[in-house]
């Protein structure tokens, strides 16, 4: 019985750690910085928002913060190569917010809509670099 308890403790610890590995849309700057690594550039935008480019492992993470919360995130490879389907799925899942993502095939570029209609994603070439962009959809209530 002790082995089973130890195994369960290890599994629980791994899942708890993994829940903090990925930051996502709406997270604060501290969590994003802990997850996305070294800051390469930081710019204050005209509207008061802040754009930050991070580098960690083989990825660039570009994030726009408004009121200290992430309102747009872009993911790309440092080498400028395409993200794999697995990588795209992983980034979308990190930004699911409890919802699911589905392809939106009404456009020439690859688009994804979140099932709760609170965010959208596009995978397109930006400045010569294949990039996944995730942003909230602002709906009126």
Language model features: what each stretch is:
Residues 6-7, 141:
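Intrinsic disorder/low-complexity segments enriched in polar/small residues
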């Amino acid at each position: 019985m002790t082995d089973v308890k130890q195994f369960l403790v290890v599994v629980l610890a791994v899942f708890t750690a993994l829940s903090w590995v990925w930051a996502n849309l709406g997270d604060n700057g501290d969590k994003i910085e802990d997850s996305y690594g070294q800051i390469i550039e930081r710019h204050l935008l005209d509207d008061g928002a802040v754009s930050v480019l991070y580098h960690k492992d083989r990825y660039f993470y570009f994030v726009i913060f408004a009121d200290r919360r992430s309102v747009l995130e872009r993911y790309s490879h440092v080498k400028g190569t395409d993200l794999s389907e697995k990588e795209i799925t992983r980034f979308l899942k990190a930004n699911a917010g409890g919802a699911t993502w589905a392809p939106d095939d009404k456009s020439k570029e690859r688009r994804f809509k979140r099932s709760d209609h609170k965010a959208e994603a596009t995978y397109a070439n930006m400045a010569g670099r294949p990039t996944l962009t995730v942003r909230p959809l602002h709906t009126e209530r």
